[in-house]
């Protein structure tokens, strides 16, 4: 029941509004008629998003910037939603631009107790897909963390939620306001960064509450250090992320304290185009964010996955950017940076820089053999 109610984005918004959790301004119900669509768009204003009620994970979303685009985009979104999710209901949300994507990890026992285990920063995205995550967020202080906690716990309590779950929010840093985006009623890909900074085994907790464990109220959960996770994907980041397939050769997985690589990589593995491109997760922990960034760069520099292209060089390059090291980014930053790189790709200086990163990665890999 909880999975179904949160999987239906229209119903999820209604539940959160009833629990006084802030939601993005938009329509309360799916749009059924063109005149209803036009009126709603006028009330909300452009730019806006058409969102599939049954969508999620960055799927079933279309941006609209004008009246001329509106009706055709609505029809396409409904058609695609029906094909992808078996549900053609579509609603409208205001497009929140230049915001951070911050999510709150919770665990509920279904018996009145909900734990908040800190936040994760997930703003570095491409095509609504996360690339790098971290905990805690460089944008969240203790006062803001308390606000996220109250919203996440209130939302989960309204469901009498049992299990591990994630409340996702968009945070407008300049206004100091955040809005509920969606709830994932499962463990996220990025859950290890929360485990590393809290010392809590989320998989174990999920099994415990499923077995009937009653959680104590208001536990003293502290955040220690900083953790980063980079998604290693079978894509070529220097050719517009074209999928890369083939056999993995010359695999070398480095080992170091506070570093790990989660995945099923093995020598000779055949990477096909039929599945999600993510191959592994490079995860590190350190006492502070600067050290964690250096540790992630080192881990990626010593990781070798031959035979195919991967996003590893992108991760190394990200760890060297001033804006990343300063924690100064939002959900548009990565795509803007990538676009700037594409436009400057013919610059010999830029090409030399990319070649140097790839060469350094290859050298580090060969030295680790």
Where is each model-derived feature located?
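N-terminal beta-alpha lobe that positions the nucleotide/phosphoryl donor
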Residues: 1-167, 171-188
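Catalytic cores of soluble metabolic enzymes centered on carboxylation/carboxyl-transfer
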Residues: 192-369
């Amino acid at each position: 029941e909880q999975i179904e109610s949160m999987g239906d984005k229209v119903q999820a918004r209604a539940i959160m509004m009833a629990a006084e959790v802030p939601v993005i301004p938009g329509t309360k119900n799916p749009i059924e008629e063109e005149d209803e669509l036009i009126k709603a768009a006028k009330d909300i204003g452009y730019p806006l998003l058409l969102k599939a009620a049954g969508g999620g994970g960055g799927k079933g979303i279309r941006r609209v910037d004008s009246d001329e685009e509106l009706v055709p985009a609505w029809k396409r979104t409904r058609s695609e939603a029906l094909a992808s999710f078996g549900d053609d209901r579509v609603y409208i949300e205001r497009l929140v631009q230049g915001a951070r994507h911050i999510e709150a990890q919770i665990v509920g026992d279904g018996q009145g107790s909900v734990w908040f285990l800190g936040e994760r920063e997930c703003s570095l995205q491409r095509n609504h897909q996360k690339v790098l995550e971290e905990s805690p967020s460089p944008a969240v202080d203790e006062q803001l963390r308390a606000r996220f906690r109250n919203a996440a716990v209130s939302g989960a309590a309204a469901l009498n939620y049992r299990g591990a779950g994630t409340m996702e929010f968009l945070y407008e840093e300049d206004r100091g306001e955040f809005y509920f985006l969606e709830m994932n009623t499962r463990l996220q890909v990025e859950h290890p960064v929360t485990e590393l900074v809290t010392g809590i085994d989320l998989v174990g907790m999920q099994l415990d509450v499923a077995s009937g464990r009653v959680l104590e109220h208001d536990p003293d959960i502290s955040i220690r250090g900083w953790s980063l996770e980079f998604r290693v994907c079978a894509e070529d980041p220097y050719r517009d992320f074209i999928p890369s397939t083939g056999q993995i050769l010359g695999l070398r997985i480095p080992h170091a304290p506070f570093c790990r690589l989660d995945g099923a990589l093995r020598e000779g593995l055949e990477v096909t185009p039929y599945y999600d491109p993510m191959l592994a997760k490079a995860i590190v922990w350190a006492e502070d964010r600067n050290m964690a960034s250096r540790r992630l760069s080192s881990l990626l520099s010593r990781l070798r996955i031959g035979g195919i292209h991967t996003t590893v060089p992108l991760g190394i390059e990200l760890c060297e950017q001033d804006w990343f090291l300063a924690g100064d980014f939002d959900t548009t930053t990565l795509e803007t940076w990538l676009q700037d790189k594409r436009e400057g790709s013919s610059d010999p200086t830029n090409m030399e820089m990319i070649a140097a990163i790839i060469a350094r990665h290859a050298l580090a890999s060969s030295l680790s053999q």
